[in-house]
Each structure stands twice: as C-alpha cells, then as structure tokens.
C-alpha cells in the first residue's frame, strides 16, 4: 500500500489515533460506507452567535465538498408532512382525467399537474418515470382539487413553512460565504419557488437501467427535500461514486442548485444526483417525494461574485430558468 493511503494528517490525531496506526485507520475509513454529512439546524435556528457562525461554516464545508447536507432539528411539522404524503397518495390515485383537470397549459409546468412521462433529465432521451404536482406562490391561480381538498390545503401550508425555512438557511449560506446575512432575503421573497409533490408509480416491468429520475442537477438556488417515502436518491461525489441518501422521516436533505453554483463561481457545488429503481419487490411499490425548490425573483443577477468567474456566465434568474426549462422538456 502506498504512503498516500496512510496520510490522514490531523484528522486521526483528533480521533485519538497514534501516527503509527494511521494505516490501520485508513483501511477502516476506506471500508466505511460514504454518507452525506448530517448537521443540526437547531444550532443556527435557535443558537447563539457562536453556534450560528459554526453552523454556517459547517454548511459551507458540506456544500463545497458534497453539494448536499442532511439536517435534523429543522422544526418542520411532522404531522403536516405525513398528512401531505397521505393526501398526495389520494390525489395521484385519481383517474387520469381528474388529475388532468389540474394541469395548467403555458406555464412551463411551474404550477399544477404534470402527467407521467413528460419531464426528462438534461441530455436524456428517455422520460423520467414520474408524475408531479407543483404548488407555487399564492398570487398565482392554483387549481383546486375538489376530490381531495386536503391536498390543496396541506400543500399550500407546507409550501409556506418550507419557504420560511429555506430563507433562514440561505442566511447561513450567506454567512458562510462572508456575505451579509440578509444578502439573499429580499431577492427570494415572492420568488418563483415551487413545492413539487412527486409520485413515482410502480414499474415492475421497466428496464433495469430505466431512471425514475435521470442524472441531473437542480436549476434553483437550494432545494429542501422532506424525507421521501422510500430510498432511491443517489448523489455523485467528487470521486465518481454514487452515495445513497437514506430516506428518514425526521431528516431534511438540502442541496445546492445551479443558480447558487453560478453565483458563487463554483465555490458551492451543484451536484449530480438521480433516483434509481429499487430491486425486487420495491419496483412494485410507489415512491413519493416532496422537494421544495427555492427560486429567487426573476430579476436577481446570477453573475459570479467569487470563485471561477470566467467559467460561469452572467445571467438573470429568469433567463437562466427559461433556458433550463427548455432543456428538460417543460417549456
């Protein structure tokens, strides 16, 4: 074994390791499964100045290395989340013609219902194996679902809660980047954010490599993913390995989108991820997911303010969004 495999530096010292045992520790670390970092959001949401600063730095480190983080202590209403999943199952169980009554033409899928097989990942010819419903800002005309009224009511409440939390997390992002804490706040209030209620139907006969959601990066600033109903999400790390993100009802997964990556000149990473079909009996079960995509107002400039400015073009958020919607078949 080459010496590079044994060089763990100060990390092993902090773990109480003796330099003579570094090679043994290196072998142990190599065998441990990779995982997305888990942070306690309560340190920022309820902590003192020192705790908030430390959390902001930890968040920056995670976003720079992985582009993803898992949070506990986020304060979201677990009962509301469970009720939203239950009403989503009722909505997606409706006949197609009833669901199509909630589709709104000409809005690029930004709100309302989008049917199965319409969206695909960038540069992917095959459609994703999913259907979804978007909740948007209340000033848009949101279609009511008369057959499942609790779906509309619960979705709108969860949207508001996730938007408020996302704005707080962007304050931590700003602090970690040495920007004023409220740098993003006014630019995301009333923005084009959406709560996507996703249904991946059973696919027992789909090809082994068929994507529930093909490899892609998110368009927006940050995404908040409420614990999914089943595993399947995988994140591509810097070593080229796919890391599974385990579904946990009490955890929130947060990731960097392309807009934030562009704004930071690549300092924060928008990481490729996908949703894969399970093996065996899992293919015969539905999977539900609740990602919240935090978008700014369309006028927000995404010109890079740090990092590799030459590699990241100057856009407004609106121009960037419209460009990407065309790439994935929603415009």
Predicted regions: what they are:
Residues 21-331:
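Peripheral, non-catalytic segments flanking oxidoreductase cores
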Residues 7-13, 26, 30:
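Acidic, Ala/Val/Gly-enriched low-complexity intrinsically disordered segments
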Residues 3-4:
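Serine residues within intrinsically disordered or low-complexity segments
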Residues 8, 19-22:
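Short hydrophobic targeting helices and cationic amphipathic motifs
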